[in-house]
C-alpha cells in the first residue's frame, strides 16, 4: 500500500485546491451525465408497456436520443469555443437539460412527448462533453491526459453503477 502512496502523490503534486475542486466537480458531473443518459434505456421496457409501443417505436426513441446528441455535439463544441467564459453555463445547462428530460419522460402521456424527452437527453449530453473537456484542457495544460482520464472515470462509474441503482429503484418504485 505504501508503495502506491508516492505515485498518488505524484499524480496530484503541484495541483492546487481550485484545480482539484474543478476536476472533482467535472468528474462527478460526468458521472451524473452518463447516469442520466443511460436511464432511458433502462426504463424502455416499462415505457413500452405503459404506452403500448411497438419495437420500432422503442427503437426510434433511442435513435432520437442518439441522433440529437450526435447532431448537437459539434454545435456544442463550436459554442464552447465561441463563448469561452460560459463553460460553467454549458455544463450546468447540461445537467438541467437532463433533469428536465427525465421529468418530461416521467410525466409523458404519449409517445410524442417521450420522443421530446429523448431528444432533450441527447441535447443535455451534447452540451456537457465539449465544455467540460475544454475547461479541463485549459486548467491542466501540462496534464491534460491525467485530467481527461480522471474525467473519463466519472463516465465509466456512472455507466457501471447507473443500471444497478436504477434497477433497484424500479424494483421498489414505479419507473415514473
Segments (PLM) and residue ranges:
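Cytoplasmic helix-loop-helix junction between adjacent transmembrane helices
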Residues: 117-154
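Residue-level signature of mid-helix packing/kink "hotspots" within the transmembrane helices
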Residues: 38, 66-74, 159-160
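Extracytoplasmic
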Residues: 25-55, 76
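Conserved MFS/SLC helix-loop-helix module at the cytosolic interface between two early adjacent transmembrane helices
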Residues: 71-109
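Short hydrophobic/alpha-helical segments at membrane-entry points of transmembrane helices
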Residues: 26, 112-118
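Helix-loop-helix hairpin linking two adjacent transmembrane segments in secondary transporters
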Residues: 155-176
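Interfacial helix-cap and linker-helix signal at transmembrane-aqueous boundaries
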Residues: 47-48, 79-80, 168-173
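Small-residue-rich segments within alpha-helical transmembrane domains of MFS-like 12-TM solute carriers
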Residues: 34, 38, 122-130, 160
